[in-house]
Amino acid sequence: MASSNLLTLALFLVLLTHANSSNDASFNVETFNKTNLILQGDATVSSEGHLLLTNVKGNEEDSMGRAFYSAPIQINDRTIDNLASFSTNFTFRINAKNNENSAYGLAFALVPVGSRPKLKGRYLGLFNTANYDRDAHTVAVVFDTVSNRIEIDVNSIRPIATESCNFGHNNGEKAEVRITYYSPKNDLRVSLLYPSSEEKCHVSATVPLEKEVEDWVSVGFSATSGSKKETTETHNVLSWSFSSNFINFEGKKSERSNILLNKIL
């Protein structure tokens, strides 16, 4: 009888362990609406369902806008020492008034939940200093129209990896972006394609997200426009999908369950 009770208790605890699994996430946005977004600064949604990050309709300079998915995303589960992998696909269009002298660019970013806009200009609304700031807890993939390159920024506007990409040459054209993060190797990869010109750009870096961002993050976009009328540009996101999963969870969960059973039985 005692053995039977112990077995029942063990099975209950295993089921409880399974119930407390990490939170995978997935969404697909073909047309944006304000109900599933946190909009900050000048960001808004057009009648066509496009995400408009910067406002330069009246040649306003120094515009900044941020938009994040309304639900927080779990990146790290410290209870089982498990880090999520993720992938995101989106399309965007940057339209500069003067494609040879425009600023500043657009970024896809992981930021703290409840984060507020930071400095404008080259800081892209994501950072308050050029130096490494661990408290920023922000990782961003930046499409830098000043330097015509893709950057990977980790808690600083000083990139840890860059690759040239001619945004000026593709002014006003739709770009297709895919970003993947493979957690077992901390491998962050970015690929961009301009279908109209067939130009491709790639960049990658090793980023230990468990050390650089908080366990729960907001995912989304931030952009800033030039501080002079001749350098203004618009940043529109046309579609967006995101998926995250704890790919090692099943193995770790089984191992944890077996340890629990062995200790009890």
Swiss-Prot record:
Q: Which InterPro entries match?
A: ConA-like_dom_sf, L-lectin, Lectin_LegA_CS, Lectin_legB_Mn/Ca_BS, Legume_lectin_dom, Leguminous_Lectin
Q: Give the signal sequence positions.
A: 1-21
Q: Which Pfam families match?
A: Lectin_legB
Gene3D superfamilies noted in UniProt: 2.60.120.200
TM spans (from-to): none
**What positions does the record give for glycosylation?**
33, 89
Keywords assigned by UniProt, alphabetized: Disulfide bond, Glycoprotein, Lectin, Plant defense, Seed storage protein, Signal, Storage protein, Toxin
Using the chain's own numbering, where are the disulfide bonds? 165-201
Q: Does the keyword Glycoprotein apply?
A: yes
Per the UniProt entry, what is one GO biological process? defense response
Q: Name one GO molecular function term.
A: carbohydrate binding
Q: Which PANTHER family match?
A: CONCANAVALIN A-LIKE LECTIN FAMILY PROTEIN, LECTIN
Say what the protein does.
Answer: Seed storage. This carbohydrate-binding lectin has toxic effects on bean bruchid pests. Antibiosis properties of legume lectins are proposed to be due to the lysis of epithelial cells of the intestine by binding to the carbohydrate moieties of these proteins.
The family assignment reads: Belongs to the leguminous lectin family.
Q: What is this protein called?
A: Arcelin-2
Write down the species. Phaseolus vulgaris (Kidney bean)
Gene name of the record: ARC2
